[in-house]
Swiss-Prot record:
A GO term for molecular function: ATP binding
Highest classification ranks of the organism: Bacteria, Pseudomonadati, Chlorobiota, Chlorobiia, Chlorobiales
Site (described: Transition state stabilizer): 18
Membrane spanning residue stretches: none
Record's subcellular location: Cytoplasm
Protein name: Phosphopantetheine adenylyltransferase
Catalytic activities: (R)-4'-phosphopantetheine + ATP + H(+) = 3'-dephospho-CoA + diphosphate
EC category name: transferase
Cofactors that this protein relies on: Mg(2+)
Amino acid sequence: MKKKAIYPGTFDPFTNGHLDVLERALTIFEEVTVLIAENSNKNTLFTVEERMDAIREITIGMDGLHVEVLHDGLLAEYARDVGANAIIRGVRQVKDFEYEFQLSLLNRHLNPDVTTVFLMPNVKYTYIASSIIKEVAMLGGDVSKFVHPSVLSMLHRKRKELKPNTTS
């Protein structure tokens, strides 16, 4: 049986921390699906299509990697449907772990065949969240150390769309 994992998230935007966790997951699992959540409860900056295109561009050439969208439904059921035996979650701080631990227990209840695997990113990414990256970028700050150049370009374009009288 192939070791297959799902790496779910909003990925708005996909950061170097996300990439770091993904690269670690690919050393453990034969197949990893980056699963973009189309979460109507979150106010996203980028469309699902924009996020999917960005992730595909950043991860081109990575063996065993797939990028999909979860439009609705439960993650545990999706894992069952695609035959995944693990859910990857990046954990930066204790605060993240408490929330993720609760989700892990619920997913295990819904699908006893799936295990949540917690991976810590490189320490240089532990204090950066997508929400902070978006906020700083939309205010004109430099986030180039925390995102891929293509994501940085997307952030600059989005800033110009939303605030047309700004430079950068």
